[in-house]
Amino acid sequence: MVSSFTSAPRSGFYYFAQGWKLVSQPGIRRFVILPLLVNILLMGGAFWWLFTQLDVWIPTLMSYVPDWLQWLSYLLWPLAVISVLLVFGYFFSTIANWIAAPFNGLLAEQLEARLTGATPPDTGIFGIMKDVPRIMKREWQKFAWYLPRAIVLLILYLIPGIGQTVTPVLWFLFSAWMLAIQYCDYPFDNHKVPFKEMRTALRTRKITNMQFGALTSLFTMIPLLNLFIMPVAVCGATAMWVDCYRDKHAMWR
């Protein structure tokens, strides 16, 4: 089925909603199964453990609040919870994406072919295995870009006042952008677009990508829904690629 998508500007919210629709398309479901299983097993177990630890971690975080901000504790406590969920959710979604990266790339490739009517390269299981080193190198590039920026934000958490007020907002914005990079990269990488060029392309539609990443980040924090977010985000990002970037960057048509 050739997509009826057009190049007309769409919001990131639209593409996130499209991900939920596309993930259940006939012919696509079988490519969803493995990423879905990886996410359910890893994120399900991780968040179950997290919720058993929150009553220890949150008081520890709140102990960094200076005395002059104690009157804001009723506002800072939920910010502390959200901060933990953001950091924890992104950390484990990164691990899940590393494990499922070859299958996410295949899902993006098959969905793109269905949306456009294009013929993808003939890649079976041996093609996927051959591509694993390149895919893992790409995942490492993303992690190397993410890590120093995340460390700076984590250090800011330790600064009294700023760490409990401003940093959670900065972390949410950073997570939104990083998740846009994470999921939009699969269709870009399928066409061998360099990592730096991909980031430059995303910046041309920064608001759209921030909207998409923000919703993905929010759903990553929600129990049960976060179990399904990986394939949904891959599908939504692929729809965005088809609309916004494919004409300029596609290697196969």
Curated annotation (Swiss-Prot):
Principal subcellular localization: membrane
Keyword set includes Cell membrane: yes
Subcellular location: Cell inner membrane
Keyword terms of this UniProt record: Amino-acid biosynthesis, Cell inner membrane, Cell membrane, Cysteine biosynthesis, Membrane, Sulfate transport, Transmembrane, Transmembrane helix, Transport
Single GO molecular function: high-affinity sulfate:proton symporter activity
Top-rank taxon, per record: Bacteria
Membrane-crossing residue ranges in chain numbering: 31-51, 75-95, 151-171, 222-242
Keyword Transmembrane (UniProt): yes
GO biological process: cysteine biosynthetic process; sulfate assimilation
Topology in the lipid bilayer: Multi-pass membrane protein
A cellular component term, taken from the record's GO annotations: plasma membrane
Role according to the record: High affinity, high specificity proton-dependent sulfate transporter, which mediates sulfate uptake. Provides the sulfur source for the cysteine synthesis pathway.
Family: Belongs to the CysZ family.
Record HAMAP family: CysZ
Protein name as catalogued: Sulfate transporter CysZ
